[in-house]
Swiss-Prot record:
It comes from Salmonella paratyphi C (strain RKS4594). This is Bifunctional polymyxin resistance protein ArnA. The record marks D140 as: Raises pKa of active site His. In the N-terminal section; belongs to the Fmt family. UDP-L-Ara4N formyltransferase subfamily. In the C-terminal section; belongs to the NAD(P)-dependent epimerase/dehydratase family. UDP-glucuronic acid decarboxylase subfamily. Pathway: Nucleotide-sugar biosynthesis; UDP-4-deoxy-4-formamido-beta-L-arabinose biosynthesis; UDP-4-deoxy-4-formamido-beta-L-arabinose from UDP-alpha-D-glucuronate: step 1/3; Nucleotide-sugar biosynthesis; UDP-4-deoxy-4-formamido-beta-L-arabinose biosynthesis; UDP-4-deoxy-4-formamido-beta-L-arabinose from UDP-alpha-D-glucuronate: step 3/3; Bacterial outer membrane biogenesis; lipopolysaccharide biosynthesis. The keyword Ribonucleoprotein does not apply. Residues 314-660 are annotated as: Dehydrogenase ArnADH. The gene is arnA.
Length: 660
């Protein structure tokens, strides 16, 4: 059986040798050129291949049509990937009749993605393993062929676990490859509900937070110990790296980051003390803990710190277009609560963000994105993360002004996306739950659910398809030109400053604002088509916390992902929302200032929205991606959200207006 192999690192060497030992013919090996900036402590696949007389290549882009054609000419029966760092295109995966198979360093479906070796140690796992699985378009998601478990000892560090995994991989391959060569290839589907995803790790991820539990800090030290970059902290402006440590008994009443003793060198964490066994000051040599304390000038009672402001690390610059909107102003507040963010914003008004205008890390320009293109391009280039939040997003406008919806929601935002591509900036783009349209799934899955819309003569769908098309364009830019992106899909976020009662007066507001206006003015609450449409209402605080975590993007887990942000537990019909709102209104201390309740009125959607409208019976999100990528769960009950939203709007009504 003829094989083409994609391989790198020690695992790549083990895989190549195992394939040869199993009697396969290797037509060619594809690998990577070593990066001079990387500590190449591992074996060289290219040297191994050259020594064996096997053709070896290291193309910059193996998925280029030229290389796809060359691989096709090799006519492989089977393809193997052993720690090759790039995803293979579907064109390559389909070239081998027997299939393409990848060796992954975890027990799938757990720890899909990058650096599973390090992540299992960071998370304090007691077991991991290696898995050979069939390759499909989604990384690490194909059917499992075979796996082998590896116990993680308490004294294991990254390098010792790496050696264990290499040994386990060789045993696994020696066992399964002869069977596969005979055409017997087991296939067990992965359980998606058990899948977890992790992104790549960077050297800066080794920064120690002494306010974490001591086991967490110790596990970080284990996970990135040499030859990885190491866990580090600061004494003043002096950086030092901890190469080995142990957990000590509780350090009661000691502030985290405080030096408890210098011989041995022990530092307080949230619930105990970390003893530093070996470490290194700056670029110096590795020494034992007490000598490190002497080198750093530490004494008992000294406080270790995070990197000083003068260390040269600048704040993350976030550009928010539509900063005065509902999401924009709440997100600005969340970002400014963190010291390491600076916010640049543009909008056509500033009423919702007036509380930030004098903030030293908030920079606002009043303007229109369709006019001020030069300002926008300059600030896309200047900033690190871009959020184009400007959109017409109220249903009545879809039928009133479909062309304006398309021009703003698609054309203007496409220009911004192209700036992000041009300057290689990360974009966090607001898709919408509307893209699912009339999907019939019980809950809408970002990666599986079909996006179903109505006929062309229903302009109500112009918003949905504009957003969906932009989602697809962004995805294509990510695939073809390396755009870093995350698409997030809000599901009926509610809260203070959602919009305004004036917007509701002209019919251009969200549902709850329109209902509140009816209560304030003593007009009947209109239930469109009886108000039986179900939605999952999400508190703005829950939504913004998820969005903030997307911006933080720990471990790059959100790159290239679509993430629903909604609360499946808060599902209610519009009629149920109106009833809950009325109950809260009757109990509110300002109730006496407003007219009597005028009752409910059932109206047809055609008479309210126009002939181009078409409604959706339900809209419920799957939030598995949010759980995996963000570690996020919504927690705020719908009643709490309704009461807070109502209170905000009632207190915004002028006293004179109440009396009238």
């Amino acid at each position: 059986m003829k094989a083409v192999i994609f391989a790198y690192h020690d695992m790549g060497c083990q895989g190549v040798q195992a394939v040869l030992d199993a009697g396969y013919e290797i037509a060619a090996i594809f690998t990577h050129a070593d990066n001079p900036a990387e500590n190449t402590f591992f074996g060289s696949v290219s040297r191994l291949a050259a020594g064996l007389g096997i053709p070896v290549y290291a193309p910059d882009n193996v998925n280029h049509p030229i290389w796809v054609d060359r691989i096709a000419e090799l006519a492989p029966d089977i393809i193997f990937s052993f720690y090759y760092r790039n995803l293979l295109s579907e064109e390559i995966l389909h070239l081998a009749p027997a299939g393409a198979f990848n060796l992954h360093g975890s027990l799938l479906p757990a720890y899909r993605g990058r650096a599973p070796l390090n992540w299992v140690l960071v998370n304090g796992e007691s077991e991991t393993g290696v898995t050979l699985h069939r390759m499909v378009k989604r990384a690490d998601a194909g059917e499992i062929v075979a796996s082998q478990r590896v116990a993680i000892a308490q004294d294991d560090v990254a390098l010792t676990l790496h050696h264990k995994l290499c040994q386990a991989a060789r045993q696994l391959l020696n066992s399964i490859l002869p069977t596969m060569k005979c055409g017997d290839i087991p296939s067990v589907p992965q359980r998606e509900s058990d899948a977890t995803y992790y992104g790549r790790r960077r050297p800066e991820d080794g920064l120690i937070d002494w306010h974490k539990p001591v086991s967490t800090v110790h596990n970080l030290v284990r996970a990135v110990a040499a030859p990885w970059p190491g866990a580090f902290s600061y004494n003043g402006s002096q950086k030092f790296t901890i190469w080995s440590s142990r957990i000590c008994p509780d350090a009661q009443g000691v502030l985290p980051g405080s030096v408890i003793s210098v011989s041995p060198l022990r530092v307080a964490c949230a619930d105990g003390a970390l003893e530093i066994i070996t470490g290194q000051a700056g670029d110096g040599i590795t020494v034992q803990g007490s000598q490190l304390a002497q080198t750093l000038g530490l004494v008992a009672g000294a406080r270790l710190n995070r990197p000083p402001a003068t260390s040269g690390k600048r704040r993350i610059r976030v550009l928010i277009l539509g900063v005065n909107g509902f999401i924009g102003n709440h997100l600005t507040e969340r970002l400014l609560n963190e010291e390491n963010y600076e916010v640049y914003g543009m909008d056509i008004g500033s009423n919702a963000i007036s509380r930030f205008l004098l903030h030293p890390r908030f920079h606002f320009v009043e303007g229109d994105i369709s006019i001020h293109s030069e300002w926008i391009e300059y600030h896309v280039k200047k900033c690190d993360v871009v959020l184009p939040l400007v959109a017409i997003a109220t249903p009545i406008e879809y039928t009133r002004n479909p062309l304006r919806v398309f021009e703003l929601d698609f054309e203007e935002n496409l220009r911004i996306i192209r700036y992000c591509v041009k300057y290689r900036k990360r974009v966090v783009f607001p898709s919408t739950s509307e893209v699912y349209g009339m999907c019939t799934d019980a809950s809408f899955d970002e990666d599986k659910s079909n996006l179903i819309v109505g006929p062309v003569n229903k302009p109500r769908w112009i918003y949905s398809v504009s957003k969906q098309l932009l989602d697809r364009v962004i995805w294509a830019y990510g695939e073809k030109e390396g755009l870093r992106f995350t698409l997030f899909r809000p599901f009926n976020w509610m809260g203070p400053r959602l919009d305004s009662l004036n917007a509701a007066r002209i019919g251009s507001s969200r549902a709850i604002t329109q209902l509140i206006l009816n209560l304030v003015e003593g007009t009947p609450i209109k239930l469109i088509d009886g108000g039986q449409q179900k939605r999952c209402f999400t508190d703005i605080r829950d939504g913004i916390e998820a969005l903030f975590r997307i911006i933080v993007n720990e471990g790059d887990r959100c790159d290239g992902k679509i993430i629903n942000i909604g609360n499946p537990d808060n599902e209610a019909s519009i009629q149920e929302l109106a009833t809950l709102l009325l109950d809260s209104f009757d109990k509110h201390p300002l109730r006496c200032h407003f007219p009597p309740f005028a009752g409910f009125q059932v109206v047809e959607s055609r008479s309210y929205y126009g002939k181009g409208y078409q409604d959706v019976a339900h809209r419920k999100p799957s939030i598995d991606n949010a759980r995996r990528c963000l570690g996020w769960e919504p927690s705020i009950a719908m009643r709490d959200t309704v009461e807070e939203t109502l209170d905000f709007f009632l207190r915004s009504v002028d006293v004179a207006e109440r009396a009238s």
